């Protein structure tokens, strides 16, 4: 990364290894007022308490924020006028949350701050705890109960569902989950190396997968229940550079400095290439047969056009809050409509 600073030591610009430039502008209080990525600006406004009051993106869509006297976020107003609201008690705990897209949810707490009940519409779920604050019972809206039991270290060792089915859990000395036993007698188990990496998993049917790691705890091989081995090698940045399957077929991968996949080459030499915009958005995929898929975006990164080859394309449109409203292709147009709460209705 290359950084440029002003006389106050604030970052003015940042250039990543791919050449993407992010520039910063500040207000009189030293707060970031503008962030520009390759010419696309996002604006920030603040209230008197230095809370973010509004964010306007490169498509001129503004989201506004409001807070109570304690600095708790109480309201988010979206570009279409819909809003999320949140109410708090004197201790700053959420007691009522009303999203723009659904029913309000109310919360009740005990003296220790544990949630005692969650109410959404007419549905109430209740919770009970032991003296250590661990959940021991959940009573669902239909009155059914799920109970929980713990060992002295606080590990969950038992769970009983509303039908009375018991699931038991056991652990290693390091409190790593070692075995799960179900009500029907079936079980799953795990084994670990000294570093805590899973080296074996046995499922309820008795099938065991084994895992191998290198000195820096990167997975280097997976051996399935039939003995088939898949091996992994990594580059200097810990990206998977090579995968060798059980038939010794090798697939190789390369990446740019930001970790974006650049090429994928299979055992037959067929190569798929990937290219990205300066912002890191996928710009094109070139397949082994020469077919090129391209992607176009708006200033905020919403996908506008997918050119899928043979002159065919898929175009997408969005509303003022970034939800897709229309997808068009040679096969026709799909229109998406939302209700007042933001739910997709058609």
Predicted regions and their residues:
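Beta-strand elements of repeat-based all-beta scaffolds
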Residues: 1-16, 20-57, 61-78, 82-99, ...
């Amino acid at each position: 990364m290359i950084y440029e600073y002003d006389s106050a030591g604030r970052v003015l610009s940042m250039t990543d290894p791919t050449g993407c430039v992010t520039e910063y502008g500040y207000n009189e209080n030293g707060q970031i007022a503008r962030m520009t990525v390759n010419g696309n600006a996002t604006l920030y406004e603040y209230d008197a308490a230095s809370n973010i009051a509004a964010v306007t993106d490169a498509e001129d869509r503004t989201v506004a924020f409001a807070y109570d006297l304690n600095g708790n976020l109480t309201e988010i107003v979206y570009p279409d006028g819909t809003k999320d609201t949140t109410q708090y008690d004197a201790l700053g705990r959420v007691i009522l949350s009303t999203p723009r897209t659904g029913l309000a949810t109310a919360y009740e707490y005990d003296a220790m701050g544990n949630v005692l009940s969650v109410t959404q519409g007419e549905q109430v779920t209740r919770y009970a705890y032991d003296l250590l604050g661990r959940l021991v019972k959940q009573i669902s809206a239909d009155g059914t109960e799920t109970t929980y039991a713990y060992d002295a270290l606080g590990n969950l060792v038992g769970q009983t569902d509303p039908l009375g089915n018991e699931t038991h859990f056991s652990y290693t000395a390091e409190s790593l989950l070692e075995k799960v036993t179900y009500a029907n007698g079936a079980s799953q188990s795990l084994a670990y190396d000294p570093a805590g990496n899973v080296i074996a998993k046995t499922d309820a049917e008795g099938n065991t997968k084994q895992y191998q790691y290198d000195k820096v705890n990167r997975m280097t091989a997976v051996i399935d229940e039939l003995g088939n081995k898949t091996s992994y090698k990594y580059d200097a940045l810990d990206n998977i550079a090579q995968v060798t399957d059980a038939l010794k077929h090798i697939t190789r991968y390369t990446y740019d400095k930001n970790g974006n996949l650049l090429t994928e080459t299979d055992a037959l030499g067929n190569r798929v290439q990937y290219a990205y915009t300066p912002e890191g958005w996928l710009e094109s995929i070139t397949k082994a047969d020469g077919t090129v898929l391209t992607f176009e975006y708006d200033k905020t990164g919403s996908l506008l056009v997918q050119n899928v080859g043979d002159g065919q394309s898929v175009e997408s449109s969005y509303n003022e809050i970034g939800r897709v409203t229309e997808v068009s292709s040679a096969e026709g147009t799909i229109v998406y409509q939302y209700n007042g709460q933001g739910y997709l209705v058609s």
